[in-house]
Amino acid sequence: GEVTSKGHGELQADIDNLKAGMAAHGATRGFMNAASPGVISLFLQNQHYATREAYLAALADAMKEEYETIVGAGLDLQLDCPDLALSRHMLFADLSDDEFVKIAAMHVEALNHALREIDPARVRVHICWGNYEGPHVCDIDMDKVFSTLMKTRARYVLFETSNPRHAHEWT
């Protein structure tokens, strides 16, 4: 069926728990993770919408409220976006790198749509190629997706590239 929010009861409980823990330890700044529209589409495949774009748009609209609720509670928002790298070899292995970059750009566009009313200074994005035990020989190179990744409406972009497969990209 259509993508809809199931409400913010569980989210509010998570926010309340985090803020209580922060207060108990004197922390004045905290962040809460949330899934990006793209990562949701990676693990929950579209079974309703006519196109991937329509599915991503529906996910972005549904997640927008969650993102705004987190930031509205005084927390920073961390979006987990392994879809911008990991999905290259998980879901889109049949595409060329250039075709995948177009998919990643579509995911960034959906994410930015959901973030359009949030100050980028309150947002960080986590991008990775997956934390599975394996050689990572099918990972897309950072230089092929970097400019697309940097278009996210986030001041902070975190790249998890500490496995040996990506060492050459930082040295």
Walk through the language-model features, giving the residues of each.
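Domain-level signal for soluble alpha/beta catalytic cores
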Residues: 1-171
